[in-house]
Every structure is written in C-alpha cells, then in structure tokens.
Amino acid sequence: MTTIVSVRREGKVVVAGDGQASQGDMIAKGNVKKVRRLYNDSVLVGFAGSTADAFILFDLCERKLEMHQGNLTKAAVELAKEWRSDRALRRLEAMLIVADKTTSLIISGTGDLINADNDLLTIGSGGYFARSAATALLENTDLDAREIATKALTIAGDIDVYTNHNHTVEELNA
C-alpha cells in the first residue's frame, strides 16, 4: 500500500504521498509518483492501492473534471457512481484523495465520498499513523500545511513497512 495525506491550513491545501510500490511482501520500486495535478494544475490527486488501477482512475477523474468544467464535487460524485456501477471499474483496487482550492474528498471504489474532517484526510496502509501525527501537529503547532503533511508522512514511514521516506508533495493556494 502506501500513505497519502491531505492537509488544509492558512490558505493552502497540500496533498503528499510516499513513493513505495510493493509486490506482496517485497519492495518493487521506491520512487513512484502517487500525487499528481489534474485539470490545468487546479486539482491535486493522490492514490493508494494498485498503481495500474490508479492510472485508470486518474484518467477517468480528468475526464469527469473536464465534463464538469473543473467542479470537483460534481466530478467526484460522477466518478464514484461510475466506479461503483461499472463492472470493470468495480474491480479496481485503489482509493483517491482529491483536493482543490475549496474541497477535499476521499473517493473509494464502493462509491463512498468522504469530506475532510478537521481539514485532514489520509488513506493507505500508513493512513492511521499519518492521521494521528497530523492531528497532533494541527492542534498543537503553528506549522504550515506542507510541514504537517511531510512530518506526518515521515512518522508513518517510520512505522508502516509499506510506506517509505521518498515524498511527493503538491500544494495549492486555497
């Protein structure tokens, strides 16, 4: 798996992820870019799960964003509906965090759309570790969104064997 973190703070939104790809109990690659920009660089997307499946979902997400002129909520609803109802897509094993200037969501293959709680979202095998660390940092420090996401990923990477310390961090002004 992996760890993806999204943090919103002080007019910034950050989506960050580690770079480890695993095959069973073996590390296949250590520098996979699991966080990308879509729709004219206005939407950040991070994935956890199967890399091949995630690329299919990135493409589908881009098409839904274009169809809805960049309206992330509408695009996410349509993506979740199609992902859940299409026989081939239903078999995809991945989760997405998507964020733009105003909205952060988790999209899952079961059709779930989850809004950010306390300006924080995490997915992947190290998600609970990263969430705990980021929550503590949000509540007890003045660190910015980028620093919180990076520190949370580092802590998750120290604990979770499926998360490494090779981070990709993308940021938008919110």
Swiss-Prot record:
Gene3D superfamilies: Glutamine Phosphoribosylpyrophosphate, subunit 1, domain 1. Keywords: Allosteric enzyme, Cytoplasm, Hydrolase, Metal-binding, Protease, Sodium, Stress response, Threonine protease. Protease subunit of a proteasome-like degradation complex believed to be a general protein degrading machinery. Coiled coil: none annotated. It comes from Aliivibrio fischeri (strain MJ11) (Vibrio fischeri). The lineage of its organism: Bacteria, Pseudomonadati, Pseudomonadota, Gammaproteobacteria, Vibrionales. One of its GO terms (cellular component) is proteasome core complex. It is found in: Cytoplasm. The keyword Cell cycle does not apply. The keyword Nucleotide-binding does not apply. SUPFAM superfamilies: N-terminal nucleophile aminohydrolases (Ntn hydrolases) (SSF56235). This is ATP-dependent protease subunit HslV. One of its GO terms (biological process) is proteolysis involved in protein catabolic process. Allosterically activated by HslU binding. Belongs to the peptidase T1B family. HslV subfamily. Na(+) binds at residues 157, 160, 163. The active site is at 2. Its EC number is 3.4.25.2. Its main location: cytoplasm. It catalyses: ATP-dependent cleavage of peptide bonds with broad specificity. One of its GO terms (molecular function) is threonine-type endopeptidase activity. A double ring-shaped homohexamer of HslV is capped on each side by a ring-shaped HslU homohexamer. The assembly of the HslU/HslV complex is dependent on binding of ATP.
